[in-house]
Regions:
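Membrane-proximal helix-loop-helix interfaces that form the catalytic/acceptor-binding platform
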Residues: 3, 30, 37-524
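Short, intrinsically disordered terminal tails adjacent to the first/last structured region
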Residues: 1-35, 362-366, 525
Length: 525
């Protein structure tokens, strides 16, 4: 079987097995063990990614993006579809998948994150299969293991978002493309087109991998001179055309979802930040680049193909982001990490098996510190890691534990509605209060809410226009605001504060937790 114009045995011959004498080197037990492991090259990376994904996956608190996923996926299907008309259309497929998952396994952090862990483990298997397809068993095994060891892979395996499924589908699309280029038959091209369509409905930005596929397909056509490979063009067009409805819906919602992303600059500083944040480790990123360079010395054709997959999507998104909306943020291009791992795997396949094993171990050691940091309780609130950390996060679980320990039947609660609804303090407290409240004591009623987000089909609830009319006879009201606040009125609007004062509520308790302040207001007799 040929691999991008080479016979697989040619690539194997590139490894230093004969010491330059032409006489095969003596095989050792370690070589036999390495070959056995290589034949199962897809299995071991999947297992490693699964173990790393499950390890301490419940320790980090849910952060606002995960809480948004929980909010949408917890709605009835009819409400979820209606909500997509206003926001979250591009994530609708993931929300529907998560909705079904929650119906079976529940909505604990561990349960919801397990879906992403399984997707990332499957992605590791696909990375190994792509590496094996290109450069043989050992390259596949090394590619998959390196991928599983990248800290950002574990980080987003533990994220209740669409990133891990997108990485899986994108890597599967690359594998299907390689199979179609090897044997350009209509069924194989249709499978590739269907996978692209699925990718678009999983994550529109992940379709940037098609830029890499175009470059790779051109290279293969140049190598092989097989005109049947031109069927790539209609296959890709079919897959992309199927995504037009979701692209149109997403474009109308872009300002509300990604308006915070700055237009990227062409500076080295900007790209250095991008690289560090893409891998969640400066040292691992450096190691992968070094190993990627080594790949060019053993199989430059395969290296060129995969380098296109690693770089072309980034360039494409950078160019698109010069327009009205910017999509240039590292986690949106997580789909390129697999390509860097495959380059590293091809480079490692040139080395003696023992040296390659040591190199993989070095990658693990280099990323060990980052692997621990991304499992800290507040780690998911550090989207710019390894830049911008320092312990800051919103301790929703701590605030909920405090409220639940002091709560009484009939209490009301007000979440910060002033200036920063995107902090999702309400979602965070509601999620953890539902798990912490004592038996027989209901979760405090959310005051000043005219419609819940599910009822309104929006991301945020609709506030009462006349707050005084929304107050009941609650003898006590909890107010939860962001940061270290001195007064509950810093967290509420002027109209809400006026309504509370008119009912003669006085502050009787203040509790500061990480990132939040909890006030208890008691009505004067």
């Amino acid at each position: 079987m040929t691999v991008a114009g080479y016979a697989r045995e040619d690539l194997a011959a590139a490894r230093p097995d004969d010491n330059g004498t032409g006489i095969p080197a003596r095989r050792t037990a370690f070589d036999d063990l390495a070959d056995l492991a290589a034949r199962l090259s897809w299995c071991w990376p999947a297992l490693l990614a699964l173990v790393l994904g499950l390890y301490q996956m419940g320790r980090p608190e849910l952060w606002r993006d995960e809480l948004a996923s929980w909010s949408f996926a917890s709605r009835p299907v009819s409400s979820l579809i209606a909500s997509a008309r206003h926001t979250g259309a591009t994530q609708l497929a993931y929300y529907l998948l998560l909705h079904g998952w929650i119906a079976v396994f529940g909505d604990s952090a561990d349960a919801m994150r397990t879906l992403s862990v399984l997707a990332m483990a499957a992605a590791a298997a696909c990375v190994a299969l792509v590496g094996r397809h290109l450069a043989g068993d050992r390259a596949g095994l090394a590619s998959g293991l390196v991928f599983a060891l990248v800290p950002s892979v574990s980080r987003f395996a533990q994220e209740v978002r669409f990133y891990a499924p997108a990485v899986l589908v994108a890597t599967l699309a690359t594998l299907l493309l390689l199979r179609a280029l090897d044997q350009p038959t209509v069924p194989r091209w249709l499978a590739y087109a269907a996978c692209l369509a699925l990718l678009g409905y999983t994550d529109l930005v992940a379709l940037s991998v098609v830029a890499g596929h175009v470059a790779g397909a051109v290279l293969r056509l140049w190598y092989d001179n097989d005109r049947r490979q031109l069927l790539f063009l209609p296959a890709a067009a079919i897959g992309l055309a199927a995504c037009l409805p979701i692209a149109v819906a997403g474009a109308s919602q872009a300002n509300g979802q990604i308006g915070w992303i700055a237009r990227p600059s062409p500076t080295l500083t900007a790209f250095a930040f991008f690289g560090r944040n893409l891998f969640y480790s400066t040292s691992v990123a450096t190691a992968l680049i070094v190993l990627a360079l080594l790949a060019w010395t053993v199989a430059w054709r395969e290296a060129a193909f995969i380098t296109a997959l690693a770089i072309a999507p980034v360039v494409a998104v950078w160019l698109i982001s010069q327009g009205p909306h910017s999509y240039f943020f590292p986690r949106y291009l997580l789909v390129t990490v697999g390509a860097w791992a495959i380059l590293a795997g091809i480079g490692l396949s040139r080395l003696d098996a023992r040296i390659a094993a040591v190199a993989v171990l070095v990658v693990a050691i280099l990323g060990a510190g980052d692997q621990q940091v991304i499992r800290e309780p507040g780690a998911h609130d550090w989207p710019a890691y390894p830049v911008g950390t320092g312990g800051d996060y919103n301790d929703f679980a701590g605030a909920a534990t405090f409220v639940a320990g002091q709560a009484k039947a009939g209490d009301g609660i007000v979440y910060q509605s002033k200036k920063a609804p995107w902090l999702m303090i309400g979602y965070g407290l509601q999620y953890y209060l539902a798990r912490d409240m004592p038996h027989g004591v209901p979760v405090p009623r959310d005051l000043f809410i005219a419609q819940t987000a599910a009822q309104a089909g929006t991301l945020y609830p609709v506030l009462c226009k006349h707050p005084a009319a929304c107050l009941g006879a609650e003898p006590r009201i909890w107010v939860v605001g962001s940061g270290r606040q001195k007064s509950p009125y810093q967290a509420v609007t002027a109209a809400q504060g006026k309504a509370l004062r008119a009912e003669h509520y006085q502050v009787t308790l203040i509790k500061h937790v990480q990132g939040l302040t909890v006030f208890l207001l008691t009505r004067e007799p």
